Amino acid sequence: MTQPPVRLLVVDDERNIRKNLRMLLEAAGYQVDVASDGEEALAKSREQHYEIAFVDIQMPKMGGLELLRYLRGLSTKTAVVILTAHGTVARAVEAMKLGAVDFLEKPFDPKAIRLLVDEILLRRRLGPGGSIDALLHLAELAWGRKAYVEARAYLKTALLRDLTRPEPYYWLGFLYESEGDVRQAAHYYYLALDANQTFRPARDALTRLGWIDSKRS
């Protein structure tokens, strides 16, 4: 039996943003509704379940924070991603405290939006008991949209599940290396080799960094 398409909602008072996000998400295979303000979005949410809603934080009639409070009052399980312009990031952080799952700053990176949708949907399918491979995939999706804090959290959760797998150590090393912390990167690459002496990616990374066993701390 064919699964119905995932429904998403885009809420923004700027027509071009609604149009561009809708086109981007529909091209990725999702069914997308749009609303120009919080009141319209709330009415749609009472009639239809949305897996994810992209909500502008600053709109006429009803802004993003007020909409988020109403959605939580409806006990809806819609994951809310806040859309914010420069200067409203502090309010986006407030929205996170109210239950928003993430926020995106304008202008948007199309790749980051697609990866975020994939990440949220995968996280929901997995629930609290996701496999290590699934957590590694979540980390990869988060890294792809430059959400390094979230990527690191997924990897550390994977380590809590199984300390003997080399991949979480390796990818933690990769994250630290991408942020310029070579010493911490090497530490995790060595931990990957401790878990599996034949794990070639970690050995190659240490060779690339110019580290040898005598430098291990």
Regions of interest found by a model, annotated:
Residues 59:
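Receiver (REC) domain active-site loop signature in two-component systems and cognate sites
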